[in-house]
Amino acid sequence: VTRDLQLMSWENFYQTTPSLLDAGFTIVNSSWIPMYIVTPVAYWSPEEVFNWDIYSWRPMHPSSPYKDRTLRVENETPRVIGGQLLAWGDAIAANYPNLADGIAAERELVAERAPMLAENTWNRQKQRDYANVRAAYQTTNRIRKEITE
C-alpha cells in the first residue's frame, strides 16, 4: 500500500497507531473515545471531546492492546495531521419511532461537539478554555435556531 494515503486510525486493534506511524503512514485521529457518536447508544460529552487531543486514542475494542487506557503518541508528530468526529446513524431507526427525531438528535450531538473538535485541530495548543468555547457555541447555536426554525 502506498504511503501517500492518509489513514484514519480508529480502533487500535487491527492496526495500531504506532505501527501505522512506524510504517510511514500519515494518519487522522479517529479515536472511538470520545470522538464517536452512535445516537442514542454511545457518545461522550462535549467536555470530553474538548479535553481530547490529536495525539491521544482511547479504543473500545475488547482485544485492543490499549483497551481501558489512553494511547499517546509523541506530540508534534508531523504525520498525525488532525482528528474527526464520527457519527454512525445506524442505531437511529431502531431507537426512534420518528426517524426525523433521531436525525435531529444526532445533528445536535454533532453540532455541540464540533467546536470542541475545532479547538483541538485548528489550534494544537488550546487558545480558549472549555467554558469560553461552550459559551460561543451556545450563542451561535441560538442564532442558527432563530434563522432555521
Where are the regions that the model predicts?
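Flexible, acidic glycine-rich loops studded with aromatic residues
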Residues: 1-149
